[in-house]
Amino acid sequence: MTDLPRDPRHDPVLLDEVIAALAIAPGERHVDATFGAGGYTRAMLAAGAEVIACDRDPDAIAGGEALVAEADGRLTLIHGRFGEIDRLLAERGIDAVDGITFDIGVSSMQLDQGERGFSFQKDGPLDMRMAQEGESAADWLNRADEYEIADVLYHYGDERQSRRVARAIVAARPLTRTSELASVVRKALRHPPGAPKDPATKSFQAIRIHINRELDELVAGLAAAERVLRPGGRLAVVSFHSTEDRIVKHFLRERSGGDAAGSRHRPAPTAAARAATFETPARKVRPGKAEEARNPRARSATLRSAVRTAAPAWPGNSMKEAMSC
């Protein structure tokens, strides 16, 4: 079934560009490692692929059951972390795939649900956990000291006034609602109402990345993709934050034989050269003005893609040890 209708309500960022990078041939097996609302998966199915879709959010998996029914046996949903996609596939007897796609960060579906605690525009419990496991945003913000909070805001949100915001958060504790946190950040930054970009944007992003250990997950996911992509398989990664994009850029540069030194997210090069596991990456792709106007979230998106070679995957996870906050 290649005539599966496209649902514009679920169109993710850079959809056409991702599908072009994947160059899907009918019958190929592709992984949508961040299922979300199913936008990439739907397009992969429409191109004739068999799709294995993964998400750590149980609500996303539950919401995808209707699409499974439409897909005539070509869609499998897996609840799990994309950093473990190689293990999740192996448990199902799959050792190689033709393509893997990552859409890093929070989904529009999660932002639209105020009760999930991701949005500064909708009031809800200060949660931000994608899988409802571990420490919530409220738990962390109400126990962490000012310096730890400031470091997270600076490194994961590029918030230049992180110290000011952290002091305001500590002074306002306890915080339990997203509206409370958003108000504290706005007041700390003295940003006028109606400004083009909400001043709470960076802080909410940084806290979410920290709570869900998203950079660690990205590092693990890239290494897992290297292990399960067949020779000629395609990798496509859409990121929304400068640190995420740097991790992807340096991973592909190193794995394609380039020099990835100079980043705090990478270890020093080893003496023994390893065979390139990816061809030279395609040029990065950014959204056009029309997509940015249609979807403001697209403004910060970057797509990077590359094709797998026949070289064996590098041993271990050479980036994981370098990731820390």
UniProtKB/Swiss-Prot annotation:
EC numbers on record: 2.1.1.199
Catalytic reaction list: cytidine(1402) in 16S rRNA + S-adenosyl-L-methionine = N(4)-methylcytidine(1402) in 16S rRNA + S-adenosyl-L-homocysteine + H(+)
- InterPro entries cross-referenced by the UniProt entry: RsmH, SAM-dep_MeTrfase_MraW_recog, SAM-dependent_MTases_sf
Write the record's keywords in alphabetical order, separated by commas.
Answer: Cytoplasm, Methyltransferase, rRNA processing, S-adenosyl-L-methionine, Transferase
Q: Which GO terms describe its biological process?
A: rRNA base methylation
Entry GO MF terms? rRNA (cytosine-N4-)-methyltransferase activity
List, alphabetically, the Pfam families matched.
Methyltransf_5 (PF01795)
Per UniProt, S-adenosyl-L-methionine binds at: G38, G39, Y40, D55, F82, D103, Q110
Disordered as annotated region, ranges = 256-275, 281-307
- Which EC class is the enzyme in? transferase
Where found in the cell? Cytoplasm
User: Would you identify the family this protein belongs to, as annotated?
Assistant: Belongs to the methyltransferase superfamily. RsmH family.
* Summary of the function given for this chain in its UniProt record: Specifically methylates the N4 position of cytidine in position 1402 (C1402) of 16S rRNA.
Q: Which HAMAP family match?
A: 16SrRNA_methyltr_H
Q: What is this protein called?
A: Ribosomal RNA small subunit methyltransferase H
This chain's source organism reads: Sphingopyxis alaskensis (strain DSM 13593 / LMG 18877 / RB2256)
> Source organism lineage?
Bacteria, Pseudomonadati, Pseudomonadota, Alphaproteobacteria, Sphingomonadales
